[in-house]
C-alpha cells in the first residue's frame, strides 16, 4: 500500500440510483452510486459502488474511485488541445478556452472537469446524456490528452517542429 493522505482528494457523488431486482419472493432493492474523486491539480478517479444501503454504496464508490486515479496533462488551467471521447452511445467533444471563459459543460462532465482543476474549457455532448456514460466519456477523453513535449517525444521531433 502507498502511504497517501486520503483527505487530499475532493469527493463528488455524480449519481445515486435505487435499483430493484425482481425474484420469485418479491423485489430486492439495492443502491448504485457513481462517485468521482480529484485533487484539483490534474488527477481524477471514477468509481461505481453497489450495496443494499446508500452509505455502504457511497463508501464502495469512493474507494473504487481512489483505486482508478489517472493523471491528466493540463496547460494553463485548460486542456492542451481539442479532444473527443466516446463511451457507449455518448460522444463528448472538448476544446481549450481562453482564460476567463469558465467551464462551459453540462451534466457530469462539469463536475469531473472541476475536480480535475480545469477552469476554462468548452464541451459539447452528442448522443446519450446518461450521467454514467457522460462521466466515463469525459475521463476517457481526458486520458487521451498529450502535451507538446509528449507528442514530440512520440514522433521523434523537437517541440518547436510540433508547435509550428
From Swiss-Prot:
Molecular function per GO: rRNA binding; structural constituent of ribosome
Role according to the record: With S4 and S12 plays an important role in translational accuracy. Located at the back of the 30S subunit body where it stabilizes the conformation of the head with respect to the body.
Protein's gene: rpsE
Domain of life: Bacteria
Record text on subunit structure and interactions: Part of the 30S ribosomal subunit. Contacts proteins S4 and S8.
Alphabetized Pfam families for the sequence: Ribosomal_S5 (PF00333), Ribosomal_S5_C (PF03719)
HAMAP family cross-referenced by the UniProt entry: Ribosomal_uS5_B
Sequence ranges assigned to domain S5 DRBM in this UniProt record: 9-72
Coiled coil, from the record: none
GO annotations of cellular component type: cytosolic small ribosomal subunit
Domain-level remarks: The N-terminal domain interacts with the head of the 30S subunit; the C-terminal domain interacts with the body and contacts protein S4. The interaction surface between S4 and S5 is involved in control of translational fidelity.
Protein's GO biological process: translation
Entry-linked InterPro entries: Ribosomal_Su5_D2-typ_SF (IPR020568), Ribosomal_uS5 (IPR000851), Ribosomal_uS5_bac-type (IPR005712), Ribosomal_uS5_C (IPR005324), Ribosomal_uS5_N (IPR013810), Ribosomal_uS5_N_CS (IPR018192), Ribsml_uS5_D2-typ_fold_subgr (IPR014721)
SUPFAM superfamilies: dsRNA-binding domain-like, Ribosomal protein S5 domain 2-like
Taxonomic source organism: Fusobacterium nucleatum subsp. nucleatum (strain ATCC 25586 / DSM 15643 / BCRC 10681 / CIP 101130 / JCM 8532 / KCTC 2640 / LMG 13131 / VPI 4355)
Keywords for this protein: Ribonucleoprotein, Ribosomal protein, RNA-binding, rRNA-binding
Protein name: Small ribosomal subunit protein uS5
Family designation: Belongs to the universal ribosomal protein uS5 family.
